[in-house]
Amino acid sequence: MPQVEHQNSTVLTDDELRTLDAHWRAANYLAAGQIYLLANALLTEPLSPAHIKPRLLGHWGTSPGLNLVHTHLNRVIKARDLDALCVWGPGHGGPAVLANSWLEGSYSETYPDISRDAAGMGKLFRQFSFPGGVPSHVAPETPGSIHEGGELGYSLAHAYGAAFDNPDLLVACVIGDGEAETGPLAASWHSNKFLDPVHDGAVLPILHLNGYKIANPTVLSRIPEPELDELLRGYGHEPLHVTGDDPHQVHRALAEAFDRALDRVALMQRTAREEGATERIRWPMIVLRTPKGWTGPAEVDGRPVEGTWRAHQVPLPEVRENPEHLRQLEGWLRSYRPEELFDADGRPTADVLACVPHGARRLGATPHANGGLLLRPLPIPPLDRFAVAVDKPGATLHEPTRVLGDLLEQVMKDTSARRDFRLVGPDETASNRLDAVFDASGKAWQAQTLPVDEHLDRHGRVMEILSEHTCQGWLEGYLLTGRHGLFSCYEAFVHIVDSMVNQHIKWLKTSRELAWRAPIASLNYLLTSHVWRQDHNGFSHQDPGFVDHVLNKSPEAVRVYLPPDANTLLSVADHVLRSRDYVNVVVAGKQPCFDWLSMEQARAHCARGAGIWEWAGTQNDGEPDVVLACAGDVPTQEVLAASALLRRHLPALAVRVVNVVDMTRLLPREAHPHGMSDFEYDGLFTTDKPVIFAYHGYPWLIHRLAYSRTGHGNLHVRGYKEMGTTTTPFDMVVRNDLDRYRLVMDVVDRVPGLGVRAAAVRQTMADARTRHHAWIREHGTDLPEVANWTWEA
């Protein structure tokens, strides 16, 4: 590995030191002003209670450190003409990032009513954490942000996601020492083993040790520096330390650290790109240790504040009520000497702006933080090239995800030059039958390789790490900066990112309301190895509840699809990969599955989202006696098997079969953009006939989606009810009363008049279930009549 030493130590001139400090002081002033001031933004008169916000909200403690980093990033971006993005892990330091955006002018360009003058400063202060204003965190409303930082742990994964396939981009990532204690952040350190120095950009982690969380010390700030260095070097970084509480000394040391780090990054990238990458790089990082709440009140009411946990939020909490707090606040604000930082009209002075880059080089104006501006349509080949031939329903079987894998392989090939599509997953690409993609791209890997390894590739675009958090963080960062991707995961274990998807949906919902944010590619989940075919791994691997979780979220941003076969999966995949600003959840099987629909039929059915399969039922021109509804591949097979049994045993019964692909179709139109009108729903499911619904997941979800429908009282749902174990595939459905025999029994029980007339049929079905129990316990396999079942029209 090439070595680099910074031969000439960075020596800031007096002018550079003065202007850097002026910028930092201005940002600190603006950050504090946002927390406290309702009026008198430039302190042109003595501060009075009337100038103070009635409710003080915000986080001061991290803001001076974020302002310091932003100031020094400005310096190196301008000096080196860098294309840069910053991920602010301590997103509760929103006042700092807003202050810097206003200083550089990107805020006023985004929000012209918040001008870069005294009037605009007053509005900037008033709107912060104020009704009708802006949130306290680095939310989507903040120019330059791709990471809100409200829920901690995801900053570093987002930063790496942004850097992948962005070879000219520097992504700085500020990691708070509180966030550094989270599990997702701990796993994210390993992302450097996946960063390709040839095709990817660089990530510069900046670990900010200000010593405290809300009310406790932080772990990494209280271990000896040699131990911390060992930890960070073990993660694969070369730490550069900056420690101090004297502003001028810290400015000089931080400028030196940035230059050393970026010199090393430039050398590493240049060597890899000119000579080829042959071994893993030890990337630099900065460890910045400064006081929490630096430059704020040293003491309040006789208790230390600066450099303690008491500086975390609002260090002076009673400014309106307490004259001493008001006096301290005015002294604090005037300590920044705002008259030197802003002219009489409130505009930043030349010294303040001396370090600020221009145009799109400004952190608040980078198009990488508004990725939709950079997004190109994904080249998706014609589906007919990959469709399975279906001459008649149920005559052939295919593994749906394997068929999808062929499509994804072609997408990988078609994006090989432009490199804007990635497949991520926690070590499950091959298990989920998507391994055809390895013919187009290997698995990204920069660590040691052995002869036994397969498909590892320093330049690969398939990303596998056994951390669902890191997978999701990578993909979110990749999407937010204008690219495309797919997250493949075992259905049960996607719950690990429940909270992460909450945050992404919130981001999408807010972004949709901002005209200046361009739509980004959707976050697409492929959930497979699902509940009904985890018979071999058992109860721990059986949980279909992610769909329930997602459908609780903002309806304008979430979609859920359960394609029943290979061709419908292709159609759904084509749709979600083209979509924008959604979280799409696709649940599909990887085991051999009957092919029900031709490609043409699949397109039409998926476009409807729900529809009648006339060939599967026995209803003629009249009304049905019963509706058999299904959603999901295994429930669809069981419904069709039940329909066949009814045709044989009760041929006079008029059975309608309805298949649902788009779960949100069940919602009322006023509750979801895809929802059906009552007229449509009643036409499909009737208002007065029994509906036996076989559903892939927890049955209560169907009741919740359809509770307001006219015929809800006639709706009877079968699904997974936590009756799981290691057993045979068919026993899984029997244990949960989703099997064909139970569905026929439900029909007999619920169609008026059948209870007596069809008692013998019901008994036959019950006997079949009894026979099943005895058979599997003796033979360990399903009944031949089940294992060898085929659809016969």
Curated annotation (Swiss-Prot):
GO biological process: carbohydrate metabolic process
Pfam family, one: XFP
Record key words, sorted: Lyase, Thiamine pyrophosphate
Top enzyme category: lyase
SUPFAM superfamilies named in the record: Thiamin diphosphate-binding fold (THDP-binding)
Alphabetized NCBIfam families for the sequence: PRK05261.1-2, PRK05261.1-4, PRK05261.1-6
The name this protein goes by in its record: Probable phosphoketolase
